[in-house]
A protein has these predicted regions:
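Active-site microenvironment of metallo-dependent hydrolases
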Residues: 1-25, 29-30, 87-89, 271-287, ...
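Hydrophobic "anchor" residues on beta-strands that sit immediately upstream
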Residues: 6-7, 63-65, 93, 161, ...
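Divalent metal-coordination and catalytic microenvironments
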Residues: 12, 32, 58, 69, ...
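Short, ordered loop/turn segments at secondary-structure junctions
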Residues: 39-42, 98-101, 129-130, 168, ...
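Active-site neighborhood of phospho(di)ester-bond hydrolases with catalytic His/Asp-centered motifs
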Residues: 62-69, 96-99, 127, 164-166, ...
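Divalent-metal coordination cores built from histidine and acidic residues
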Residues: 80-192, 517-520
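Histidine/acidic residue-rich metal-binding segments in metalloenzymes
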Residues: 145-165, 171-237, 241-261, 271-292, ...
Length: 599
């Protein structure tokens, strides 16, 4: 019996991620799925029955890659713009957790991301964000919330297959009933429960897992990896965890079926140069077996999520595949989704991304008076959490006020987002620390723009270790509540950067310092008009503005590999160990807020 075939691909070197081998063969596509997958060469009859025949001349064919822990918003673009950039790198399926938009807009924000992701050539599944807000209102001012009832409602959407990372791990193991109810709602809806465990070990980790949480993607060490695997977790390795020690530990495991590769967060400039393919390549370069690394980005994530028709080159699987000239050689030469060629040589083959722009969404930023804050608001001790009785000294006639204060200082570093806290004697001159290594920082809640809200007075915090010696940075993209984060050395420059962001209706800005008698220099600006988080411009356009801001930050002294990412994580109130909120300094482990001035 002759079978009609939409496409026949021959002379392929097929990567078998199940048996960890390769073989020469051919396969056919029918109605978007793989029909025959065979070794050797097809018969003349098979070729003649195909509507189209592609001869790969021995090129490699691997399954399309699945990134099953990621946040589209980290690339600062809408889903359609993200798909246009990620598809040419071979990422054919993603599981997005839109917890950035969710933290600003709640359940309607998740639904907006669902709608904006439909009709794309990339397969987009969604996790309902579990920690909105990420922590309690006593720690920081939230902008939105998601209830267990909303989880149940959103889970009815066919693309919703998971409950996003449970970030408030301390709250959960301490018995927070709301968090437990969120997990119960997810479990009852049949969703995969995702974890976020940067520091739990021993009995605390066991209690966390016992709620039904199945995975972790945070920074790994060999010991952490082994404990989580022993306790039944699926371990997701993102780029910062691809170290020689971790890879060596993974390669020493007799069973690696629960070890996956993910991206988590990819900034727009990095997205231009690669997506999950870059993580796979780095893993291989660090000593990971090539086909095993591919399995960690294809069949294993598909198995984890129960997406059994994805992640393999086998009969009945969706015809999502990637063509490379050599094993795991990227970028791919061709990318297919459902048997349709969607990308070739690093670019989309057709205008396959839907043309209509996504519906506009607001996020309170546009409600601010752009000039609501001035230099006086950004002096240390100007408002709540100020210097009080902890100061000494007095201004000399005609000189700037000079004071001494016992302050709590957040100590950051260039390598990661972990921070410590120290108490120091700090000298202030007109509200600015004399020590050039210290910067001022504050978070302004979006809620301050709500009609009828009382005027907000910023609480200033001191941070050491950023390397920022000049200029100021402001952003409406600040994990996880995405209130407005501002940092710099000079209060007037901080006000300039903030004004630029507010005038734009959201975004990121870097403002250079300038002498008081001179006009301000050119402000570098990246506009994010959709909820203060996203742009619908092409990734290349957004990346260019992003690069300008990163270059400005580096020129201003920052040495971090990803300076913008580091700054956006400083307000993340569930990330160890001390962070900045609109209330003051967050002691993450102690689940409390400390004043910037030591008692």
């Amino acid at each position: 019996m002759t079978m009609a075939r939409d496409l026949l691909v021959k002379n392929a070197t097929i990567v078998d991620v199940i048996t960890h081998s390769t073989y020469g063969g051919w396969f056919t596509v029918r109605d978007g799925s793989l029909a025959e997958v065979e070794s050797g060469a097809p018969s003349a009859a098979s070729e003649s029955s195909a509507s189209a025949v592609v001869d790969l001349g021995g090129a490699y064919v691997q399954p399309g890659m699945l990134d099953i822990h990621m946040h589209i918003e980290s690339s600062l673009v809408t889903p359609r713009r993200f798909a246009a950039a990620a598809l040419p790198h071979g990422t054919t399926t993603i599981l997005q957790d839109p917890h950035e938009v969710a933290n600003v807009l709640g359940g309607p924000g998740v639904r907006w991301m669902l709608e904006a992701s439909r009709g794309l050539p990339q397969r987009v599944y969604t996790a309902v964000s579990s920690c909105v807000p990420a922590t309690s209102a006593e720690i920081e001012t939230p902008n939105a919330s998601i209830s267990p009832a909303e989880v149940t409602e959103l889970a009815r959407e066919p693309e919703v297959i998971a409950l996003g990372e449970m970030m408030d791990f301390h709250g959960l193991i301490d018995g927070d009933e709301h968090l437990a109810a969120m997990l119960r709602a997810g479990m009852e809806a049949g969703l995969t429960l995702e974890g976020h465990v940067p520091s739990l070990t021993g009995p605390d980790l066991s209690r966390y897992i016992a709620y039904g949480i199945r995975s972790d993607h945070t920074l790994m060490t060999p010991a952490k990896l082994l404990e989580q695997l022993r306790k039944g977790m699926w371990v997701m390795i993102q780029e910062k965890s691809v170290t020689p020690a971790v890879v060596s530990t993974i390669m020493g495991l007799p069973d690696r079926s629960r070890v996956l590769l993910v991206t988590d967060d990819v900034m727009p400039n990095r997205l231009l140069g690669g997506h999950l393919d870059r993580i796979v390549r780095r893993a291989i370069d660090t000593g990971w077996d090539p086909i095993d690394a591919l399995a960690a980005a294809t069949v294993r994530p598909a198995t984890y999520l129960g997406l059994h028709t994805l992640g393999t080159i086998t009969p009945g699987a969706k015809a999502d595949f990637v063509v490379t000239q050599a094993l795991a050689s990227y970028p791919p030469t061709q990318v297919y989704v459902g048997g349709r060629l969607v990308a070739r040589a690093g670019a989309l083959t057709v205008d396959s991304i839907p043309a209509p722009e996504p519906a506009p969404i607001a996020g309170l930023v546009e409600e601010f008076d752009a000039n609501a804050f001035d230099a006086a608001d950004f002096k240390f001790g100007a408002h709540a959490g100020g210097v009080g009785d902890a100061v000494s000294g007095s201004p000399a006639g005609g000189q700037a006020e000079r004071l001494n204060v016992r302050a709590r200082v957040i100590e950051a570093n260039d390598e990661n987002s972990f921070t410590t806290l120290a108490e120091r004697d700090v000298t202030l001159e007109d509200g600015v620390p004399v020590d050039p290594g210290l910067v001022l920082a504050t978070v302004i809640p979006r809620a301050a723009a709500r009609p009828g809200a009382a005027p907000y007075q910023p609480v200033m915090v001191l941070i050491d270790g950023l390397g920022l010696t000049t200029g100021a940075y402001a952003t409406t993209f600040a994990h996880d509540s995405h209130n407005i984060f501002v940092t710099g050395r000079q209060p007037a420059t901080m006000a300039t950067a903030l004004t630029a962001v507010l005038e734009a209706g959201g975004g990121m800005a870097f403002a250079p310092d300038a002498p008081a008698a001179e006009p301000r220099g050119q402000v570098s600006l990246l506009r994010l008009p959709l909820a203060g988080l996203l742009s619908d411009e092409p990734v290349a356009t957004v990346a260019a503005d992003f690069d300008t801001i990163e270059a400005s930050l580096r020129h201003a002294g920052m040495q971090a590999r990803n300076p913008v990412l580091l700054l956006t994580l400083l307000p993340l109130s569930v990330s160890p160990d001390f962070k900045v909120s609109d209330k003051g300094i967050v002691d993450v482990q102690g689940r409390r807020v400390l004043t910037p001035v030591a008692a």
